[in-house]
Amino acid sequence: MFQGQRGWFCGSVSHDLRQFWVAEGGTISDPRAADFLFSCDASHPDTLRIYQSLDYIEDNATVFHAYYLSAVANAEIKNSVALGHFILPPASLQKEIRRKIGSFIWEQDQHFLIEKHDEVTSNELKVFRESSVLATDHKKDLSKSTEKHFIRTPVVEKQMYFPLQHYPVNNMVTGYISIDAMKKFLGELHDFIPGSSGYLAYHVQNEINMSAIKNKLKNKY
C-alpha cells in the first residue's frame, strides 16, 4: 500500500500506527524529506513546528490526521479510503470549522478514535499481513492486472468513508462554504493575482511574526 513512500510522524501518533505504515512498505523520515506528514494532535509541539514553517505557509506542506492509517487498516478495500478527507488544520481554525459544518471525520465515532482506545494492535497487523499475502496469491492466479485490491475481514464492520455527494459536510476537510450557499455576482469577474495592483496575499498563523513573513516573501519579488 505505501511501498516506497516516506512518512513523518508527530510524537502524538501511536507506535502501532507507525508499525502499520512500515509493515505496508512505507519508511519513516524527517519532515523535509517526507511525502506525507501525520499527526493526531494539531496542538502538539511537533505539529506546531510544521504549521509555523515556511513550507506550510506557502502551501508546500499538508498535515494529515493519522486516523487515516487506522481507517485503511479497517477498510474492506484499502484503496477506498480517501486521504483528502483527513487533512488536519491548525487548532486555531478547528473551532470555527466545527461551528460551521460539524465534526471532523476522525471525531464522528468516538469508538474509533485512535488516540483513545482503538489503535491498530499487533494482532491486527498480523491478520492484515496474512490476509494481504492470501489476497495477492489469489490475484496472481486469476489475473495479471496491475490494479491491486486488498480485501480483509475488518475487526469491526464499519463504513470508513462517505459518499462524495455529501463531501465535505460529512468528511469535514476544508470548512469552506458550499458554492450553492454563496450569493450570485452578476458583474464582470477578474482574476486576483497576488502581487499585482499593489496587493499581496498572506497565510499567517497567530504564533508567527507578520514582519518576518513579509520580509521572506518580498525577497521573492
UniProtKB/Swiss-Prot annotation:
GO BP terms, alphabetized = homologous chromosome pairing at meiosis; meiotic attachment of telomere to nuclear envelope; meiotic telomere clustering
Entry superkingdom: Eukaryota
Looking up InterPro entries in the UniProt record yields: TERB2
Q: Which UniProt keywords apply?
A: Chromosome, Membrane, Nucleus, Telomere
Quote the subcellular location field of this record: Chromosome, Telomere; Nucleus inner membrane
A single GO cellular-component term from the record reads:
chromosome, telomeric region
Keyword Nucleus (UniProt): yes
The subunit structure is:
Component of the MAJIN-TERB1-TERB2 complex, composed of MAJIN, TERB1 and TERB2.
Q: What does the function comment of this entry state?
A: Meiosis-specific telomere-associated protein involved in meiotic telomere attachment to the nucleus inner membrane, a crucial step for homologous pairing and synapsis. Component of the MAJIN-TERB1-TERB2 complex, which promotes telomere cap exchange by mediating attachment of telomeric DNA to the inner nuclear membrane and replacement of the protective cap of telomeric chromosomes: in early meiosis, the MAJIN-TERB1-TERB2 complex associates with telomeric DNA and the shelterin/telosome complex.
Q: Which family does it belong to?
A: Belongs to the TERB2 family.
Name listed for the protein in its UniProt record: Telomere repeats-binding bouquet formation protein 2
